[in-house]
């Protein structure tokens, strides 16, 4: 997928999750 410039190491994807991104290997991907 495409990296969404948000990490999810300590907290889940927040803003980018609204854009359809999900956590994968500590990084939010679309």
UniProtKB/Swiss-Prot annotation:
The record, for InterPro entries, names: Cyclotide, Cyclotide_bracelet_CS, Cyclotide_sf
The SS bond pairs are 4-21, 8-23, 13-28
**What tissues contain this protein?**
Detected in stems (at protein level).
- Domain of life of the native organism: Eukaryota
Q: Tell me what PTMs the record reports for this protein.
A: This is a cyclic peptide.
Q: Name one Pfam family in it.
A: Cyclotide
Its keywords, alphabetically, are: Disulfide bond, Knottin, Plant defense
GO annotation terms (biological process): cytolysis in another organism; defense response
Q: Does the keyword Ligase apply?
A: no
Q: Could you tell me at which residue positions the Cyclopeptide (Gly-Asn) crosslink is annotated in this chain?
A: 1-30
Keyword set includes Secreted: no
Domain comment?
The presence of a 'disulfide through disulfide knot' structurally defines this protein as a knottin.
Q: Its function?
A: Probably participates in a plant defense mechanism. Has cytotoxic activity against HUVEC cells (LC(50)= 2.26 uM) and various cancer cells including HeLa (LC(50)= 3.48 uM), MCF-7 and K562. Displays very weak hemolytic activity. Binds to and induces leakage in phospholipd membranes, particularly ones containing 1-palmitoyl-2-oleophosphatidylethanolamine (POPE).
Which protein family is named in the record?
Answer: Belongs to the cyclotide family. Bracelet subfamily.
Kindly provide the name given to this protein in its UniProt entry. Cyclotide hyen-L
Source organism of this protein record:
Pigea enneasperma (Spade flower)
The upper taxonomy is: Eukaryota, Viridiplantae, Streptophyta, Embryophyta, Tracheophyta
